[in-house]
Amino acid sequence: MSVNRDRPHVLVLPEDDANRQLATGFHLEVDFASQRQMQVLPVAGGWMEVLNRFMTEHVDNMMRLPNRHLVLLVDFDNRPDRFDRIRTEVPPEISERVFILGVWSEPEALKQALGSYETIGSALAKDCREKIDKAWRHELLRHNRGELDRLNQHVRPILF
């Protein structure tokens, strides 16, 4: 299902299938009336491919579509520089509408701690809806704090 490009909407570009399942779990919790305002895109196949697709397939569209928001959902692979490496590639004109989120190591570690990917995604969405951060406080997710604050400000009103 594609989004209505004339209304504020959110695309999620997942690195791998585990991240796609997290995003799907999140999407299942989005308010029914807002379901078409979010779309989980096909798996990119690695964080570098997420960055490549962002640059080649999404930057121009985001420049033309002011209602578009994009979540780059990547594994941080315990790399403190991963966020900055991606953020430096985001053009300043669209930076407030691009969000970089992910598990600090890999989603598999989060799955062992919290359950299925869709269950985790669902819990993260419920936190956003209820303006709490219970699931987001997990040690493998808490590095997302700054992006989560921005996400709650810009994306939460679109989906919840």
Q: What kind of region is each of these model predictions?
A:
Residues 15-16:
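Helix N-cap/beta->alpha junction signal
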Residues 12:
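Short, surface-exposed binding/anchoring microloops in extracellular/periplasmic proteins
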Residues 1-9, 20-42, 51-160:
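C-terminal accessory helical subdomains adjacent to catalytic cores in phosphodiester-
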